[in-house]
């Protein structure tokens, strides 16, 4: 598989290392955030992997879609535009797979959280909140992974209806609000936790990333899957689609 990387930052370099270490895959081209992106630059590619920033992705995604090459996107911060972009992908007969986090471990965390949120829903004595920690260089908060985790709770526990990112001084948290707190500290790669609490006990679910290898290898595996999927059934996909296929194999 010939891969074009869009983004040459820390994640892009990690992905390049994994691709180059593989006998089956090769880096076809690497584009920096500042490079001009047109559909033609992707000629000869079997897959595109985008790890840039929101503004760069929004400036480039139309060219990536128009190229007809399947696109794996790890850039976060554009969730509100996802329905629109998914429509554009489907209308063009192209393929795109988006995930806020490609780590297999963190996606097991999502599925465990999903089940926990569902199980405690009938029992009002259990409350739930989320927290995330990242290095001081991470600009967005909460992280895309934390937002995905929060959505899992909202989708599976009707007692929680809205996400609260920051508490206002003097205002109490309402019972239907899900607090998602953020910490920026040192060089932390990423820690995501769900805390379920009652008067009797506390349950904690935590995923801790030790390095970027899990994210990068997951993105490459997702690109391999999407390249095959594109040939049979083009469309807009998420990590859940890939994992459902992977776990059922």
Swiss-Prot record:
Active site: 134, 138
Reaction catalyzed: (S)-2,3,4,5-tetrahydrodipicolinate + NAD(+) + H2O = (2S,4S)-4-hydroxy-2,3,4,5-tetrahydrodipicolinate + NADH + H(+); (S)-2,3,4,5-tetrahydrodipicolinate + NADP(+) + H2O = (2S,4S)-4-hydroxy-2,3,4,5-tetrahydrodipicolinate + NADPH + H(+)
GO CC annotations, alphabetized: cytosol
Pathway recorded for this protein: Amino-acid biosynthesis; L-lysine biosynthesis via DAP pathway; (S)-tetrahydrodipicolinate from L-aspartate: step 4/4
GO BP, one annotated term: diaminopimelate biosynthetic process
SUPFAM superfamilies: Glyceraldehyde-3-phosphate dehydrogenase-like, C-terminal domain, NAD(P)-binding Rossmann-fold domains
Keywords: Amino-acid biosynthesis, Cytoplasm, Diaminopimelate biosynthesis, Lysine biosynthesis, NAD, NADP, Oxidoreductase
InterPro entries in UniProt: DapB_C, DapB_N, DHDPR_bac, NAD(P)-bd_dom_sf
Chain residues that bind (S)-2,3,4,5-tetrahydrodipicolinate: 135, 144-145
GO molecular function (one): NADP binding
Domain of life, per lineage: Bacteria
This enzyme's EC code(s): 1.17.1.8
UniProt KW Membrane keyword: no
Subcellular localization, as worded in the UniProt entry: Cytoplasm
Protein family (similarity comment): Belongs to the DapB family.
Task performed by this protein: Catalyzes the conversion of 4-hydroxy-tetrahydrodipicolinate (HTPA) to tetrahydrodipicolinate.
Name used for this protein in its record: 4-hydroxy-tetrahydrodipicolinate reductase
Provenance organism: Chlorobaculum parvum (strain DSM 263 / NCIMB 8327) (Chlorobium vibrioforme subsp. thiosulfatophilum)
Gene name tied to this protein: dapB
């Amino acid at each position: 598989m010939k891969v074009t990387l869009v983004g040459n930052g820390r994640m892009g370099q990690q992905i390049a290392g994994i691709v180059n270490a593989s006998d089956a895959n090769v880096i076809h081209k690497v584009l920096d955030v500042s490079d001009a992106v047109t559909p033609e630059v992707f000629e000869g590619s079997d897959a595109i992997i985008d790890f840039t920033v929101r503004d760069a992705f929004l400036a480039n995604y139309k060219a990536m879609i128009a190229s007809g090459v399947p696109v794996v996107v790890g850039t976060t911060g554009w969730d509100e535009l996802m329905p629109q972009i998914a429509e554009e992908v489907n209308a063009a007969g192209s393929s795109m797979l988006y995930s806020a986090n490609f780590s297999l471990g963190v996606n097991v965390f999502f599925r465990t959280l999903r089940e926990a949120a569902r199980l405690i829903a009938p029992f009002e004595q259990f409350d739930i909140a989320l927290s995330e920690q990242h290095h001081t260089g991470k600009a967005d908060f909460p992280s895309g992974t934390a937002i995905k985790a929060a959505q899992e709770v909202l989708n599976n526990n009707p007692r929680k209806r809205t996400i609260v990112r920051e508490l206002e001084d003097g205002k109490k948290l309402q019972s239907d609000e899900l607090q998602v707190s953020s910490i920026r500290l040192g060089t932390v790669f990423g820690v995501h936790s769900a805390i379920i609490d009652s008067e009797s006990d506390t349950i904690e679910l935590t995923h801790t990333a030790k390095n970027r290898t899990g994210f990068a290898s997951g993105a490459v595996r997702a690109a391999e899957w999407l390249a095959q999927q594109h040939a049979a059934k083009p469309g807009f996909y998420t990590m859940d689609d890939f994992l459902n296929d992977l776990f059922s194999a």
